[in-house]
């Protein structure tokens, strides 16, 4: 039986086409996974570099300069060092909870990125309950901290875990009330709809100007949720050695380090989305309508511009928590709880009532 060479070539080309389709299919399968992970990783590296440089400037010293140009690879060097450190376990602690605790904290913060929009419909999960889902997910992280403190079988670690739980409960409620005010003002709990509601009026339509009291309450509450100075009571070195991190070393300690900066990144992105107009340009005093409608531009250019403005606003906002860390002293535990329950909670509740009243009267 004689087979025509053209038929053999056609069969070979068809098989090569099928194999190339499979390869491209695998590539497109991993792109949606690789892109957010790489973006989050780069975001954390930028935050670490910014904090080191800003703190060096405040303290009038030279920051990192040997790990890469301008020290931009210092965070990678620190992470690599922690990766090869010995992973010690407490002899009388609960090993399972001790190992699970850091993962619970990091995963809960990573899941918060699902509802953060970086552009027009450029969001992993455009849900109608976006901000409510973020509040629910962020409340899981203190459970991981409490697990870590309890499983360490150490009085300092356990005290740090209890402080983390008490601090989270104290500031989660004002934070939720501020988010509810924004949802009422925008008539939606979707993060995309909240940004859409702000772009209609340009720069002066940002919720920063429409909700100044809520913005201040949200700012203080988010700093407390991130456990940044002056709210780092769960890991106060002078009182608790290192708090719930005392018994941790190696990669598990690195996960807590990563979670701290991830939480700061999430908070700054949500401030951008909820109060700073999201991805919109919104330049004041420029009467060009197209500049206010940057969220309607499609294609690669529009996507790039949207991501750029979102990240630019977020990183500009980061100067506030980073500068606060190196300028304000740590509060006492009673002062922290009084600030949350006796000051922020009434202010956030009053702001919610004012927002509700204004919305009812505007009907």
UniProtKB/Swiss-Prot annotation:
Protein name as it appears in the record: NAD(P)H-quinone oxidoreductase subunit 1, chloroplastic
Localization: Plastid, Chloroplast thylakoid membrane
Regions crossing the membrane: 27-47, 98-118, 127-147, 248-268, 300-320, 336-356
Name of the encoding gene: ndhA
Originating organism: Amborella trichopoda
Known catalytic reactions: a plastoquinone + NADH + (n+1) H(+)(in) = a plastoquinol + NAD(+) + n H(+)(out); a plastoquinone + NADPH + (n+1) H(+)(in) = a plastoquinol + NADP(+) + n H(+)(out)
GO biological process: aerobic respiration; photosynthesis, light reaction
E.C. number: 7.1.1.-
Residues in the signal sequence: none
Keyword annotations: Chloroplast, Membrane, NAD, NADP, Plastid, Plastoquinone, Quinone, Thylakoid, Translocase, Transmembrane, Transmembrane helix
Membrane topology field: Multi-pass membrane protein
Pfam family, one: NADHdh
Any one annotated GO CC term: chloroplast thylakoid membrane
Family statement: Belongs to the complex I subunit 1 family.
Top EC class, one word: translocase
GO molecular function: oxidoreductase activity, acting on NAD(P)H, quinone or similar compound as acceptor; quinone binding
Subunit and partners: NDH is composed of at least 16 different subunits, 5 of which are encoded in the nucleus.
Keyword field contains Membrane: yes
Predominant localisation class: plastid
Origin: domain of life: Eukaryota
Function: NDH shuttles electrons from NAD(P)H:plastoquinone, via FMN and iron-sulfur (Fe-S) centers, to quinones in the photosynthetic chain and possibly in a chloroplast respiratory chain. The immediate electron acceptor for the enzyme in this species is believed to be plastoquinone. Couples the redox reaction to proton translocation, and thus conserves the redox energy in a proton gradient.
Keyword Transmembrane: yes
């Amino acid at each position: 039986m004689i087979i025509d060479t053209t038929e053999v070539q056609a069969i070979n080309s068809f098989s090569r086409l099928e194999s190339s389709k499979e390869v491209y299919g695998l590539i497109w399968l991993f792109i949606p996974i690789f892109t957010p992970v790489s973006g989050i990783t780069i975001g954390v590296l930028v935050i670490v570099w910014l904090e080191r440089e800003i703190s060096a400037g405040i303290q009038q010293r030279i920051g990192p300069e040997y790990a890469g140009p301008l020290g931009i690879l210092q965070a990678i060097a620190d992470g690599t060092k922690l990766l090869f450190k010995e992973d010690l376990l407490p002899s009388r602690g609960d090993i399972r909870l001790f190992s699970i605790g850091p993962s619970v904290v990091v995963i809960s913060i990573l899941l918060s990125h699902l509802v953060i929009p970086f552009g027009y419909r450029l969001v992993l999960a455009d849900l109608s309950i976006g901000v409510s889902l973020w509040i629910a997910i962020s409340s899981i992280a203190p459970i991981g901290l409490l697990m870590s403190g309890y499983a360490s079988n150490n009085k300092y670690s356990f005290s740090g875990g209890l402080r983390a739980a008490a601090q989270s409960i104290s500031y989660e409620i004002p934070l939720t009330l501020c988010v509810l005010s924004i949802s009422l003002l925008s008539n939606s709990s979707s993060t995309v709809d909240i940004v859409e509601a702000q772009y209609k009026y340009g720069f002066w339509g940002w919720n920063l100007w429409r909700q100044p009291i809520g913005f201040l309450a949200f700012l203080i509450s988010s700093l407390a949720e991130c456990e940044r100075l002056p709210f780092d009571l769960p890991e106060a070195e002078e009182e608790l050695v290192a708090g719930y991190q005392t018994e941790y070393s190696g990669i598990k300690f690195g996960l807590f380090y990563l979670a701290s900066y991830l939480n700061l990144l999430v908070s700054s992105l949500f401030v951008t989305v909820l109060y700073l107009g999201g991805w919109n340009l919104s330049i004041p005093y420029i009467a060009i309508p197209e500049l206010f409608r940057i969220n309607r531009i499609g294609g690669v250019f529009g996507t790039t511009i949207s991501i750029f403005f979102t990240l630019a606003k977020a990183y500009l906002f980061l100067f506030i928590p980073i500068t606060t860390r190196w300028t304000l002293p740590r509060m006492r535990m009673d002062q922290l709880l009084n600030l949350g329950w006796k000051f922020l909670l009434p202010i956030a509740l009053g702001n919610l009532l004012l927002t509700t009243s204004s919305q009812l009267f505007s009907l």
